[in-house]
């Protein structure tokens, strides 16, 4: 696959080509992006534009709550907090820290609709 000049668009292309979730690869019910270590937006691969604000707000809320001191390579921060995202529980945000040597330099993030997140009772 040829790379574009926009890393956000490359992330979008890779997700749609590899997703098992039909909502992601057919309806494009997601957004991906790159953020600084402080949570500022660097690049967005447009999927569903309504997620842009929610994804940035969610990353900043995670950083405020947990801090960055304990984040290590291989960690993934996951949340579906509907209050922060301004959405609903099926919208999951994944934030993967990016390191250069030992320094946290940013995050790769994805906010997407998951068809099934489980519940106390079937069908609810």
What residue spans do the PLM features occupy?
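Long, charge-dense accessory insertions within large macromolecular proteins
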Residues: 1-56
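Acidic-enriched, low-complexity/disordered segments with a strong bias for Aspartate over Glutamate
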Residues: 6, 10, 29, 75, ...
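Conserved mixed alpha/beta core segments that line enzyme active sites in large multi-domain catalysts
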Residues: 13-14, 18-21, 40-42, 56-97
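Short alpha-helix boundary/capping segments
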Residues: 47-50, 90, 123-124
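Acidic, glycine-rich active-site loops and adjacent beta-strand->loop/helix elements
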Residues: 48, 81-85, 111-116
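FAD-binding core of FAD-dependent oxidoreductases
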Residues: 50-53, 93, 109
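Mobile "lid/hinge" segments at catalytic clefts and subdomain interfaces of large enzymes
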Residues: 101-124
